[in-house]
Curated annotation (Swiss-Prot):
Gene: grpE
Full protein name: Protein GrpE
Amino acid composition bias (Acidic residues), ranges on this chain: 13-28
Assembly: Homodimer.
Localization, UniProt: Cytoplasm
SUPFAM superfamilies, sorted: Coiled-coil domain of nucleotide exchange factor GrpE, Head domain of nucleotide exchange factor GrpE
Gene Ontology MF annotations: adenyl-nucleotide exchange factor activity; protein homodimerization activity; protein-folding chaperone binding; unfolded protein binding
Cited PANTHER family: GRPE PROTEIN, GRPE PROTEIN HOMOLOG, MITOCHONDRIAL
Key word Chaperone present: yes
Location of region: Disordered: 1-36
Length: 190
């Protein structure tokens, strides 16, 4: 077909067709921009909702941490206040027995043998209570000197003992659950 066979548009028709094409393109671009805008707005709203939820979760977590910290501080405070309660209740009978021993010793015509036996039993009760709470005595007589557990007060010549051996204990030492509370004060052989 030749160019002459195609229907010719008048310049007015051509201009109208051009305007229609431009309007159609604008309408389609407006609708695509509107759809894109709607998608962006929806995405922004979703992100804002997520942000709000994250902030609320962070606030709840901070409040929970504050409560946990407060409860832990209260537990530590109670442990400091009442941690020795069982120990004290075990020591009270010892104190009572010592009081009775003093009364018996002060009584007129007191039998010192009975007082001595009473004090010995009280000491045994005290040592049993201490042991029950993890306190052990360090009485190293005859053992090699250990500077981690013993404090040498003096060193003397002793032909009957090996050098660096504890030959006398001035004061017994104590450990609490294996940790030294007080070293034993000792005399060591040279």
């Amino acid at each position: 077909m030749s160019n002459q066979d195609e229907p010719q548009n008048s310049p007015e028709e051509f201009a109208e067709d051009q305007q229609a094409d431009v309007a159609l393109e604008e309408a389609s671009s407006d609708s695509s921009e509107t759809a894109a805008d709607v998608d962006l707005v929806a995405r922004i709203e979703a992100l804002e909702a997520e942000l709000t939820e994250a902030k609320e979760q962070a606030l709840r977590a901070a409040a929970e941490m504050h409560n946990v910290r407060r409860r832990a501080e209260q537990d530590v405070e109670k442990a400091h206040k009442f941690g020795l309660e069982k120990f004290v209740s075990d020591m009270l009978p010892v104190a009572d027995n010592l009081g009775r021993a003093l009364e018996a010793a002060a009584a007129e015509g007191a039998d010192m043998t009975a007082v001595t036996e009473g004090v010995d039993l009280t000491l045994k009760s005290l040592m049993d209570s201490l042991k029950k709470h993890g306190v052990e005595s360090v009485n190293p007589e005859g053992e090699p000197f250990n500077p981690e557990l013993h404090q040498a007060m003096t060193a003397v010549e002793n032909p009957d003992a090996e050098p660096n051996t504890v030959i006398n204990v001035y004061q017994v030492g104590y450990t609490l659950h294996g940790r030294l509370v007080r070293p034993a004060m000792v005399v060591v052989s040279k």
